[in-house]
Amino acid sequence: MKKGFRGTGTVERVDFPNKGIAVTDDGDRVIVKNTIPGQKVEFVVNKVKHQRAEGRLMEVIEKSPLETEEPCPHFGMCGGCTYQTVPYEKQLDMKLTQVKKLISDAIGTEKEAGYEFIGIHGSPKKSEYRNKMEFSFGDEYKDGPLALGMHKRGSFYDLVTVSDCQIVDEDFRTILKATLDYFSKNNIPYFHRATHKGYLRHLLVRKATKTGEIIVDLVTSTQTEGFNEEELLAGFRYELLTRHYDGRFKGVLHTKNDSVADVVKNEGTEVLYGDSYFYEELLGLKFKITPFSFFQTNSLGAEVLYETAREFILGDDKDSLNGKTVYDLYSGTGTIAQLMAPVCKEVVGVEIVEEAVCAAKENAALNGLDNCKFIAGDVLKVLDEIEEKPDYIILDPPRDGIHPKAIGKIIEYGVENMVYISCKPTSLARDLQIFMDRGYRVEKICCVDMFPNTYHIETIVALHRTDL
């Protein structure tokens, strides 16, 4: 099969991350992303490497028997969701199957390696679950009208105005529509990714699930030729605050960003209304959140994730960490550290993002926890500098997993038990092989779905040292 070949096939299965395996009538297998098991699809081969063909999806010729749900009106064009047409229980089955295959291919099956795969916990909310959205300004086609939303699937430039997005609630949709209407009416240009000309860049919206507090941050360039920016922003603030919401506005912000990269970068933020932060609650703790804070995007799902992790850590003995020191590596804003602090002597969190460390310290003080210590720095380097030795280690690395050299240093502590929380199963499978080769065994595994209708999945693993 050569590059440029156009063919059809039936999707046999979907492997993580979102890689459909389509089988042609001749028995050839082609990887086609954004597909669902059972679909008959048309594809064009765009890559052949090591005799493995990858194709771009051209058309779904026949739906899968799994597809029984009515999707969001933007589904298919929007690059956000992948499984919206599949009932939620089937989505969970698909994700569980994908993770089980990756883990068993890496370290063996449950029977071979002696671990327990508990299953998968679903999200408490299947729709309208996100507490944060980052919308982009642009157009739906070249020289088209202003759009505000998500990138079209497979496109860097074109956008879809997701005014009926189903993974956020009505307040998000109201804010998007109000913003688009206002700037369209005033003929304000968006920042073009190719020419680097224009004003409007991104709209960041956050809403606390528990408190209902909302902050909106308009991200723009500093190119204000042709209009009075102060008057424009005053009108924008008025447009937002005069609409009806189920939640309540805590702040309207304006961030300047002249970076040529298509990312939200803070080069200065001013408060147009209210405050630059709000509060969210998780498992009885309060967290102060700014527009750029890292925080799990599904608050109710995060409670399931962290409660499951806490059960893995403590087991049947709720006093097992009394008088002990816990390392929380890749600690982010310190959520797990603060949940564990009441049951241990001290928690030491290490995180490379300084803003997240500052937030962790502030949140620990907010929750009256004086036995949490947070250090800003690379885990690989910081581990050489910490004097306290851990009795237990919690790992919650970014998508790429743990640097092999850092794994070596972690293993050298020789702690009896660890918990690994992963947001990318492929990285997890790779890292587990290293831990098992160096004297640890996997005791139990559980998946938690934080992202319904997408292919993303969280996995929690309990590790136990075998050579003590």
Summary of predicted features, one role per range:
Residues 118-125, 193, 200-202, 447-450:
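Short, solvent-exposed loop/turn elements at beta->coil junctions and helix N-caps
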Residues 38, 168, 298:
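Short, conserved phosphate/pyrophosphate- and ester-handling motifs at nucleotide-, phospho-/glycolipid
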Residues 1-17, 222-468:
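Rossmann-like S-adenosyl-L-methionine
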Residues 59-70, 79-190, 210:
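Extended interfacial segments that mediate partner engagement and assembly in macromolecular machines
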Residues 157-201, 222-254:
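Internal alpha/beta scaffold segment
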Residues 20-25, 149-152, 217-219, 360:
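Short, acidic/hydrophobic/Gly-rich beta-strand patch recurrent on exposed beta strands
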Residues 206-208:
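Structural signature of eukaryotic scaffold interfaces centered on beta-propeller domains
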Residues 1-74, 111, 153, 373, ...:
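Terminal RNA-binding accessory module
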